[in-house]
UniProtKB/Swiss-Prot annotation:
Principal location class: secreted
Source domain of life: Eukaryota
Function: Ion channel inhibitor that inhibits the increase in intracellular calcium upon depolarization in DRG neurons. In vivo, both intraperitoneal and intracranial injections into mice induce hyperactivity.
Modified positions (4-hydroxyproline) in chain numbering: P60, P63
GO MF annotations in UniProt: ion channel inhibitor activity; toxin activity
Protein name: Conotoxin Kt6.1
Tissue: Expressed by the venom duct.
Similarity annotation: Belongs to the conotoxin O1 superfamily.
Cysteine disulfide partners in this protein: C49-C62, C56-C67, C61-C77
Length: 79
């Protein structure tokens, strides 16, 4: 009986804290989609061109680099 009461009270407490947190953070994440989009653009794997030492099988090398060693597995961007 005591354990059941403790569980019920803890669930109510956690639910109340979640609701309070949701109310206070409702307007804090404006433009979240735009921020995530900008973060995705800055990821190393999301660049439009391959940097030095990266593979150039599926995307072209960055300016100033060329694709060398283009065998069956693709080449590597080198200056």
């Amino acid at each position: 009986m005591k354990l059941t009461c403790v569980l019920i009270i803890s669930v109510l407490f956690l639910t109340a804290s979640q609701l309070i947190t949701a109310v206070y953070s409702r307007d804090k994440q404006q433009y979240r989609a735009a921020r995530l989009r900008d973060e995705m653009r800055n990821l190393k794997g999301a660049r439009d061109c391959g940097e030095q030492g990266q593979g150039c099988y599926t995307r072209p090398c960055c300016p100033g680099l060329e694709c060398l060693g283009g065998g069956t597995g693709g080449g590597v961007c080198q200056p």
